[in-house]
């Protein structure tokens, strides 16, 4: 928290809201949120209940702070879709602003999880985005399935990396597409296990927009 506050101060923030657990959850939160299909695919399928927890804490935050705008990074592509669905469901007058993924010089998407990587793991982690970029170029002259399989194979060929899932989806609905002609807005969302622990890293790339 201290490190985050220092960064926020450099950015000119006037206030930081850092509530205790008791402030956020004065009573047990029994609300259940589900917005198929965006909460049931990809992360929703591999981590059941994850987005319900996200919606619980984000909705509490919105109710307490009452913001006009909320900013979310595109690295977690699915989370943005879930939060937008939550805002529509709750009828909040709130603009969700999508922020470009910020990357290290070697292409690794910035994330708090990166601090958990060992030196060896940190050295191979950028190969995830390298494979995604190569896949985008490859996809210009190959089928969607061929592109999908190449990205997965390229990452799995790296010792210490293992793809949990790689989904090529409609950028709005998050439903998997079978052909490049299925949508005008196509994104690839990936989760990769890195290292022996392992650390779970997510990333994405836009194929068509």
Describe these PLM feature segments.
Residues 1-161, 169, 173, 205:
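Nucleotidyltransferase catalytic core that binds NTPs
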Residues 150-209:
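Phosphate/ribose-recognition catalytic cores of enzymes acting on nucleotide-derived substrates
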């Amino acid at each position: 928290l201290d490190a985050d506050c220092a960064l926020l101060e450099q950015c000119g923030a006037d206030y930081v809201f850092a509530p205790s657990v008791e402030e956020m959850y004065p009573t047990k939160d029994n609300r259940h949120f589900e917005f198929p299909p965006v909460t049931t695919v990809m992360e929703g399928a591999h981590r059941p209940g994850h987005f319900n927890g996200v919606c619980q804490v984000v909705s509490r935050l919105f109710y307490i702070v009452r913001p006009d705008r909320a900013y979310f990074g595109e690295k977690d592509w699915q989370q943005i879709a879930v939060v937008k669905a939550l805002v529509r469901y709750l009828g909040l007058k709130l603009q969700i602003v999508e922020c470009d993924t910020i990357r290290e010089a070697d292409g690794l998407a910035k994330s708090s999880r990166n601090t958990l990587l060992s030196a060896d793991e940190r050295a191979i982690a950028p190969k995830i985005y390298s494979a995604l970029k190569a896949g985008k170029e490859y996809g210009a002259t190959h089928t969607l399935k061929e592109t999908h399989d190449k990205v997965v194979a390229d990452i799995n060929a790296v010792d210490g990396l293992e793809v949990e899932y790689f989904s090529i989806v409609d950028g709005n609905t998050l439903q998997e597409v079978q052909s490049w002609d299925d949508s005008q807005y196509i994104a690839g969302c990936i989760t990769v296990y890195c290292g022996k622990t392992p650390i779970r890293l997510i990333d994405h790339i836009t194929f068509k927009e």
